[in-house]
A protein has these predicted regions:
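Charged, heptad-repeat coiled-coil alpha-helices that serve as long linker/dimerization "arms"
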Residues: 1-81
C-alpha cells in the first residue's frame, strides 16, 4: 500500500504571516473605515475629482481587506489539515 501523502503544512514564512494576519486585517479594516468616512465627507461632494479619487482609494482598501481574508482562510486551511 503506498504511503499517504502528508497534508500541506505551513513553512516558516507562511507561519509568520499567519501569526500576524489578525493584526494585518485589523490595520486594513481601520484604513478601510477611514476611507469610508473620507468618501462620505459632504465637504467634497461638489468636487467630482476628489470624490472619484476617494472612491478609488476606498475600492482599493476594500480589495486589500478581501485579499487578506482570503489569504487568512487559505493559511487556516493548511493549519487545520
Amino acid at each position: 500500500m503506498p504511503p499517504t501523502p502528508k497534508p500541506p503544512r505551513l513553512g516558516y514564512v507562511e507561519k509568520r504571516e499567519w501569526e500576524q494576519m489578525e493584526k494585518s486585517i485589523l490595520v486594513a479594516e481601520r484604513y478601510l473605515t477611514a476611507c469610508q468616512e473620507s468618501a462620505a465627507d459632504p465637504r467634497v461632494a461638489a468636487d467630482h475629482k476628489a470624490v472619484r479619487a476617494r472612491l478609488e482609494t476606498l475600492a482599493a482598501a476594500q480589495a486589500k481587506v478581501d485579499e487578506l481574508y482570503a489569504r487568512w482562510a487559505s493559511l487556516e486551511a493548511k493549519v487545520k489539515a
